[in-house]
Amino acid sequence: MKRGALAVVLVISLVVAACDGSAVDSTTAPSAALVGELLVSAAASLTDAFAEVEAAFEAANPGVDVVLNLGASSGLREQILEGAPADVFASANTSNMDQVVEAGEASDPAIFVTNLLQIAVPAGNPAGITGLEDFAREELLIGLCAEDVPCGQFALEALANAGVTPSIDTNEPDVRALLTKVEAGELDAGITYVTDVLSTGGTVGGVDIPEDDNVIAAYPIVALTNAPNPAAAAAFVDFVLSAGGQEILARYGFVAP
């Protein structure tokens, strides 16, 4: 073979080898794992369920540290609109989520569970509460959530459906604060969610509200537009919507939409 032809063959061989090497590297390189802190702002009624969701998600993604920010949905909404860092927002109603979307902080939220209201009473129901009509009895100590939070809005809607004008002694900042007062015997009754009564393991009793008067609370979730950790935020939302996430939520009394 002539010297010039040999040189051409060697150059071609080196180019092919280089291409083959780069192809192998690109196909065998591992995909980046989810890492970092994940800030989840969630309604107070999700406290127990999301604690288990957090543990399950972290077990599947050991590089992620989920930080739950729990409270009234209206307060969480304000935090987000005022620029507080958050990756995921899970609200106990659609109106707070709608305001976040309208402000350009999120898009395409998904309803992931529903919930129903229930009258919460101290263990043994010492005041003998039988229904919403008892909320008009001035001699009883009655509590609701504040009117600007979902559980308060839904409670007033249920009372209106039943034609009851309530005699209210306290309005609590979120559903867990109301539940705590009922559990301590400081109130004869309050209106919470079915899931909150269930979470006490029997230290709070529940009186059902008739279907015609009750209100279905739809819970939306979304990865926020300005999420500091967008990849983990999207993965967390996907997990909540997955069969595994729904199984966890069902154990706490939530119902799939």
Per-segment meaning from a language model:
Residues 1-8:
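Bacterial N-terminal signal peptides that target proteins for export
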